[in-house]
Amino acid sequence: MIDFETEYTPFKTTSHDWRTDIFDGLTFPPLGNPPNRKVLNVFQPDFCRPVQLRYNRTVSKFGFDMLHEYVLKLIDVEQCPQMDETCPEADKLDITKCLSAEIPTETVFLSKPHMYGHNSSLTNINFQPDFNKHESTIYFEPISGTPVRAQLRIQLSTNAWIDRLRLNPDGSTE
């Protein structure tokens, strides 16, 4: 993985900060057949954290006899730093620190569309997300590890913070 820092926030990281292999999203290892890597962790600079791709199945698609299908898993690296296949998927990830150091934490969240895969029935009222419409997938050629086709489907949500102004009798505000 390459080192990362941004001019917009104080967030920065180096490859030595991680307890596992993390790829930069430009190159991937050969995967083998059957796949010898069930998990690929990819650092995503837009979110200032790695995202996980997990092996789902082997398919015949797009003119190829055999492709390995991997699906996106949102793993909270702070809760599961080893980033392996035993890590539970988070419902949402707080990415506020990647966007700005000036807005409160827990303001901007990353999730799957319509909270696909979310485990709370309270927030899934009338949502009927399905794999074909809402899952992020990437298909790899197994021998070279070359990505053939990918579709990234994510949702950004924000918490609305209300900062009430006080109106003074003279019309000024605090």
Where do the protein language model's features map onto the residues?
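Extracellular or lumenal secretory-pathway regions
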Residues: 1-65, 72-174
